[in-house]
Amino acid sequence: MSRITDVHIHIQPWWQLKPTVQEAMRKGKEDHWELLISMMDDPRALLEVMDRSRVWRVGLVNYPSPDIMGFDDSTNAFAATYAQANPERLIPYGGVHARFTKDPTGDVDRLIDLGIQLIKIHPPHQAFPANAYTDGLAALGKIYRRCEERGLPVMVHTGTSIFPGARSKYGNPMELDDVAIDFPDLRLVMAHGGRPLYMEEAFFILRRHRQVRLDVSGIPPGKLLEYFPRLAEVGDRVLWGTDWPSPGVKDLRQNIDQFLALPLAPEQQQAILETNALALFPMESRTHA
């Protein structure tokens, strides 16, 4: 396969990470930490890794989380600028922090003007549930509404997070039931499938709401069918992702090869690795109305 898209990798301004967060990120990567740091500065280094791994495109996950992770709003400009090195292969993601924004609608518009292709909401790292607009966080509802109006997909982290200060109680995918009902034309990507505590909830949301897609990043590929034994039923809405180089994810290609060893039909493998991402990020339309 020559058109593999990994919709979930972390190329971010890691120099903004809080010291305790950076320590957790660095664990297990000591022997190649400097290479990873250089990759955050140099898109050519990432493209070389992608070429070796036979990965065509990647989604560059970025979002503000100043109080928990350390990332400020400049992470959006970082992603947009980084992706300019190869707009065909590098897809920039950004975020608007619902607890801190003073102009949620305008901030979404400004990200689109920057070239951001997807908004990332990270409940455990931003300290609110994905449906917090139902309980007073009006800015979050305005973010969803503007993304719905502009056709901008929204990725929501589901499941736990190991980083210091992360609020894993906000990672339950069931909160997306409200979002999918209240914003029926919003394209939602459910990152990580609720791993490891909320897999059944994630599958329920996926089956109930056609506009929700599942991103399998952060799930060991060899356990994917153990966690989601009925994956083939929703195979047209499953997106390939690795979460690389987050803790526990060593290699882009290794994960792909482990996935290809699963007892899935070739057409299902192709849909997950290639076709479904092309429907979300079509090459002929990388801008939004």
Residue positions per predicted region:
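Catalytic pocket-lining loop regions of alpha/beta-barrel enzymes
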Residues: Q117-L118, A132-W240
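Short aromatic-enriched loop/helix-cap "lid" or pocket-rim segments at secondary-structure transitions
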Residues: W15-V21, T105-D107, N131-Y133, A166-S168, ...
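Mid-to-C-terminal alpha-helical segments outside catalytic/metal-binding sites
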Residues: S2-H10, W14-R57, V234-R237, P247-A289
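Generic structural signal for well-ordered alpha-helices
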Residues: P43-L47, N76-A83, V108-D109, L140, ...
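Active-site neighborhood of phospho(di)ester-bond hydrolases with catalytic His/Asp-centered motifs
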Residues: I4-V7, L60-V61, Y93-G95, L188-A191, ...
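Active-site gating/metal-coordination segments in enzymes
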Residues: W56-R57, S65-I162, R208
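Active-site environment of divalent metal-dependent phosphoester hydrolases
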Residues: Q12-W15, S65-I68, A98-K102, Q126-F128, ...
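Conserved, mostly hydrophobic/aromatic
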Residues: H8, M50, A79, L111, ...
